[in-house]
Amino acid sequence: MAPSRNGMILKPHFHKDWQRRVATWFNQPARKIRRRKARQARARRIAPRPAAGPIRPIVRCPTVRYHTKVRAGHGFSLEELRVAGIHKKVARTIGISVDPRRRNKSTESLQANVQRLKEYRSKLVLFPRKPSAPKKGDSSAEELKLATQLTGPVMPIRNVFKKEKARVITEEEKNFKAFASLRMARANAHLFGIRAKRAKEAAEQDVEKKK
């Protein structure tokens, strides 16, 4: 293989009958067919449920590098299910993924996922366990006739980018130091508790001196 990008230039010392140990990839086309057949078999097995599996929550990617993007998470938090009015045990039976480890750190994420759950619930076609005796919440016979299996992801998540029109850069924007501002904000957040503790101790010492 030719060197790729800025990696180390290798000096391969071939010993140990290396021709017998060459990694081959001849099973790739057959593996592709096998995966496709497995997907189709799974879709038939879980029909009429969505072929892609249960609905996933909207989550933000971690770290400063990627946190402007959203993607599908593992499962909805217990708080999101509670606000949406869905029991955690019922959720798994109607195609909603649940992750009890997840915590909501912002109101925006909570509201977005609660809205997503409510929208999913309104569009859901629920088949009765016994066709002869449908229960409350099950879909009507007309809806069941029109129901088809969803092949793609359930309510796909899209990153929406708002384009800005070209304009003249202001003097204030030119003088703004973005990196320094971010570092300062991060330092202030890190030192908030320490500074509060120091201020409290200083205030207590002043009270003692006055006595």
UniProtKB/Swiss-Prot annotation:
InterPro entries: Ribosomal_eL13 (IPR001380)
Gene3D superfamilies: 1.20.5.110
UniProt keyword terms in alphabetical order: Acetylation, Cytoplasm, Isopeptide bond, Phosphoprotein, Ribonucleoprotein, Ribosomal protein, Ubl conjugation
Gene Ontology annotations of biological process type: translation
Record GO terms (molecular function): RNA binding; structural constituent of ribosome
Record localization: Cytoplasm
Cross-link Glycyl lysine isopeptide (Lys-Gly) (interchain with G-Cter in SUMO2), where in sequence: 123, 145, 174, 177
Residues carrying N6-acetyllysine: 16, 177
Sequence position, cross-link Glycyl lysine isopeptide (Lys-Gly) (interchain with G-Cter in SUMO1): 174
Primary location class: cytoplasm
Residue positions where Phosphoserine is found in the record: 77, 106
Family, as annotated: Belongs to the eukaryotic ribosomal protein eL13 family.
Its biological purpose: Component of the ribosome, a large ribonucleoprotein complex responsible for the synthesis of proteins in the cell. The small ribosomal subunit (SSU) binds messenger RNAs (mRNAs) and translates the encoded message by selecting cognate aminoacyl-transfer RNA (tRNA) molecules. The large subunit (LSU) contains the ribosomal catalytic site termed the peptidyl transferase center (PTC), which catalyzes the formation of peptide bonds, thereby polymerizing the amino acids delivered by tRNAs into a polypeptide chain.
Known partners and oligomeric status: Component of the 60S large ribosomal subunit (LSU).
Protein name: Large ribosomal subunit protein eL13
Protein's gene: RPL13
